[in-house]
Each structure stands twice: as C-alpha cells, then as structure tokens.
Amino acid sequence: MPNAKQTFLYGLFFSSITVLFWGMLPIALKLSGGFSDPITLTWLRFSVAAVILGLWQWQRGVLGEFKALARKDWLRLFAAGTFLIVNYTSFAWSLNFLLPGSAQLSFQVAPLFLALGGLFFLKEVINWQQWLCFVGIGVGMLVFFHPIFAQGGQGSIWFGFGIVQLSAAAWSMYALLQKSLFKRLAPSNILLAIYVYALVVMLPFSTPSALLSMSADDIWIAAFCCINTVIAYGAFAQAMRYWQTVQVSASVALTPVMAFILTELCVAFGWWTDSISSSHADILSLFGMLIVVASAINVQLISARVQRKAALLAKPLTEAV
C-alpha cells in the first residue's frame, strides 16, 4: 500500500502522462489528415484499442460481466458508442480548420454540456458559482479568438469551432450514458464494448484499403494515434486510482495549454511545416486561454465541494434511519 507521498507522486505522474498524450493527440490527428479521412482513422484507432483491451480483459477473466446485461443496457451501451464515434470523428474533422491548441481549448465547453445533461436528464442542480464558471469559459473563448473578430472573413475557423462543439456535446452524452452503466459494467468493459461496436459500425463507411498506401512516416503517425488512445485512457484510469476525481479533472483541464506549447515547439523546431503553424497568439489571447483553463478547473473544484456538502447532509439522515 503506497504512503501519502507515493500516492501523490503516482497520481501526478499518471495525470501528467494523460495531459501530455492528450496534448499531443490533436497534433498527430492534424498530421493524419494528409493520408487518411477522419472516419477511417477513427475506425483504425477503435480497432487497435479493441484488440489490445479485449486481450487484456480476456486475460483478467472479466468478460463474464456482459452475460448479465439486459436489453435496455445493451441499447444504452450502443447509444454511448454512437456518441463516442461522433466525438472522435468530429474532433479529428475539426482539425482541418483549427490549430491543435485552439481545438483543445474549444473543447473545454464539455463541462457545460455535461452539466446541462445532468440538469435535464438526471435532475442535478447547477449552482450560481458553477454558472459563473461557465460564463467565464464563454468569455475566455471570445477573448482567445478575438483576432478572428478583428480580421473578419474567417468562416472556416468558426465552422471548425462549431464542429468542436458538436464533438463536446457528443462526448457529454457519452459520459452521461456511461455513468448510467457503471452499476452494470466496469469502465474498461464499457470501453471494450464501444470499441468493438465502433469497429463493426464504422467499417462500411471507412476505407481501410487507403491505409495500405501509407508512407513510413504516415505509418508512424497512424500508429501513434492508435497507441495514444490506449496510453492516455490507461494513464487516466491509473490517475483516478491515486488521486481524487476533482484533482485529475483539474489537471486534465491543462490539456489545451499542453497542446498550445507542443504546437509552438513543433513550429520552433521546424517540424511538419506544411501542416503545423503557429497560432501567433497575442497577450490578450493568452489571457483568454488562462480564463478558460481557470474556469474549467474551478468548475471541478466547486462540483467536488457541492458533492461533499451533499454527502455530509445525507449522512445524519442515514444514521437516523
């Protein structure tokens, strides 16, 4: 059993790995646009993840959980898979119009969509502090993208921003459906079922034959996209073992900053100049990014505090009964 210091260091390590790999992912996805369409690449990522995770779950002997699922559980599982397919595919598509850092920052509206989903479907409450953070995310987005307002004629960027919102909304619906399945399946089995479902459903719409003509560099990029899916989610799951959910969520909110830094490093070293370019963000845009990240972190902190208060209020009632 690790002590408190080891627990903190393990949590920090796995959270950092998660942020690093999620920060690198949009760069790799943008590079993949030169040799693969978003649907085919997403199909490949799901297929590789399904094989790796399937072998892992089979070795652990936990596949028997699926035998206990009812019809409505399977329907929820397939619906969650459909939303995750939309999430993966649309985010990859958005990178045809946005820089990696901008796409990751735009995705920070996901907590708002998740909260609204909880409000409408799970009857959860959003307090005024959370609403204030959501307003902060919106204001930060406007400040970050302020050069676009000044330039005008940047319709493709707004189109990309809209695609990211679709991706974030789809991810939020996936997260809500996944939450409803936690009592029936382990999170790893939920992901496995979704990966296999996506592998089958997306095959008619993808062109795997196009992957056979990839160059050596293209193969490395595609392989990284696939392995990234496994490593990032694996590190995220491990981080959740050692840190509280709010700590992990707050650290993951730094992903846009990581994506921005990595993009600028690629530009500084002259890597992939045909695909990766600098955002040329000014001080005001960087301030907008800071507002978005700070607001996203505060949403997690406030939500955790609300949950703790609710648990403390419920405890005396339970003891009284």
Describe the function of each predicted region.
Residues 7-11, 35-43, 68-73, 146-168, ...:
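Juxtamembrane helix-entry segments on the extracytoplasmic side of multipass membrane proteins
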Residues 14, 20-51, 102, 170-197, ...:
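Juxtamembrane helix-loop-helix junctions in multi-pass membrane proteins
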Residues 19-20, 44, 103-109, 178-199, ...:
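Helix-helix packing/entry segments at the starts of transmembrane helices
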Residues 26, 60-107, 143, 223-243:
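Specific transmembrane alpha-helical segments of multi-pass solute transporters/efflux pumps
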Residues 27-30, 53, 114-116, 120, ...:
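Transmembrane alpha-helical segments that form core, pore/gating elements
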Residues 35-86, 113, 169-177, 191-210, ...:
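Transmembrane alpha-helices of multi-pass small-molecule transport proteins
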Residues 46, 146-147, 218-220, 252-321:
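C-terminal-most transmembrane helix of multi-pass membrane proteins
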Residues 52, 57, 110-132, 257-284:
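C-terminal transmembrane-helix exit sites in multi-pass transporters
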